[in-house]
């Protein structure tokens, strides 16, 4: 398989075959992210993609789902994605759906007809980094889109039949705005009704522009207690019809997962109980962060 540079996938795509169709990230300018900072954006050659599909067909002929990598494979033109999808079905006839990372920006350039065609070819379950329901936070993170643009493009995906999961970054607004952020996150999630919500904490890595703000004291990270309370207050306000809540990223202080609305009360109770068990000395602290933002309590 052809993989260039770092390769990431959502944890819930563990059973999917990863096929590289782009290298790096076409945006690569979010102030919190260093995942692809040293990787030049490129598109994969079709012959390499087909070679990988032949290899996958030999090793995993019964696979049901393919996840296209890297950072925002949906940036490819609708025509290119359609060709790739057709080749996937040719080499892997048991594949039912094809997912990938996508940005709101990637959807804007595709017509309603493009989206409908891609849906017909099995493209479904896009993973989109929304991060926050506040425009001021999206601008600060340099996501490259506004909340209104997100609303419009997510509605277009839904109309075309393309499902999506949304990533929410707890702590993205900083410690002064955590409550406002929690409320705004719940509002946009209730409006868009994603198939899955993936929560993780903001973790400031070396090389990220936002780290300079933290060092200068112009951006204040959530405390450990605020991270949990922000997630809890967001969860309490969620009114969803059929959405997986996936709070199992390694950075999450208290891992929770379930189906909403069925498990809402259970998840709220787990967060409340977990918060009550955290020693007071940690609640107002900014713990050291380890791998992928895991809190290290000493």
Residue map of PLM features:
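Auxiliary Fe-S-binding modules of radical SAM enzymes
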Residues: 1-13, 190-298
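Canonical Radical SAM [4Fe-4S] cluster-binding loop centered on the CxxxCxxC motif
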Residues: 4-48
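Hydrophobic faces of well-ordered beta-strands that scaffold small-molecule active sites
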Residues: 17-19, 64-66, 96-102, 126-128, ...
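Aromatic/hydrophobic pocket-lining residues that form the small-molecule binding cavity
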Residues: 49, 81, 111, 150, ...
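Conserved strand-turn element in the central/C-terminal portion of the radical SAM core barrel
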Residues: 105, 133-137, 157-181, 200-206, ...
